[in-house]
Regions:
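Alpha/beta enzyme core
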Residues: 2-199
Length: 202
């Protein structure tokens, strides 16, 4: 059940009203269970991939993630979205990561503005991020690397916990201007979440 048209199917989901419920999966079986329950899209999260392989997200290689993506997309027909972490390095590394992961049949991926190697200090409420300018370059390289126009590049900012809501919004808009089509960010509370939803650009 090869998912050769994952990006196109994801685009169709985006046209529907309401939210897309992309359940988190960590292997082909969990993805197939979701599909059997009527879920329309699944998401391979970095933490889930690390735990599912008993490796830990910061230690996973691009090769290991690409292999996991291949197995998952081969097991289901629904679109698969993937957490590509920091893109495995500098902008050129991001470009290669996008090319390798796109070949697996996934619908798209998101890259984040944390440093590489990633620290994953979520439990300490600390995020180590690169400059906005460096992340903008990564987004541009990611967009340039994709071969399928339907393939979705999402930008993610993790800076709100340490740099504040306003900086997160500034970065999100910068990533959109750099070519990202979607944004993932993490407001610190419900009030910030409401502000985020109320903004047209983010």
């Amino acid at each position: 059940m090869s998912q050769l048209n994952g990006p196109a199917r994801f685009r169709q989901l985006l046209k529907k009203p309401g939210y897309i419920q992309a359940l988190g999966v960590w292997d082909p079986l969990s993805a197939r269970v979701c599909e059997s329950m009527g879920v329309e899209c699944v998401h391979i999260g970095g933490y889930q991939a690390g735990v599912g392989t008993a490796i830990s997200e910061p230690l996973m290689t691009l090769t290991e993630l690409a292999m996991l993506c291949h197995y998952v997309t081969a097991a289901v027909k629904i679109p698969v979205f993937v957490d590509a972490g920091t893109g495995f390095g500098e902008p050129l590394h991001v470009m290669r990561a996008v090319r390798e992961l796109e070949r697996t049949g996934i619908a798209g991926l998101h890259i984040e503005d944390q440093i590489f190697p990633k620290r994953a200090h979520y439990h300490k409420y600390v995020e180590h991020t690169v400059s906005c300018e460096e992340m903008v370059d990564k987004i541009k390289y990611a967009v340039a690397a994709k071969t399928n126009p339907d393939f979705v590049i999402m930008g993610r900012t993790d800076c709100m916990a340490t740099s504040g809501f306003a900086e997160g919004v500034r970065r999100a808009n910068a990533y959109l201007e750099a070519g990202a089509e979607m944004i993932m960010c993490f407001p610190n509370n419900d009030e910030e979440m409401k502000l985020e939803i109320g903004r047209a650009h983010v």
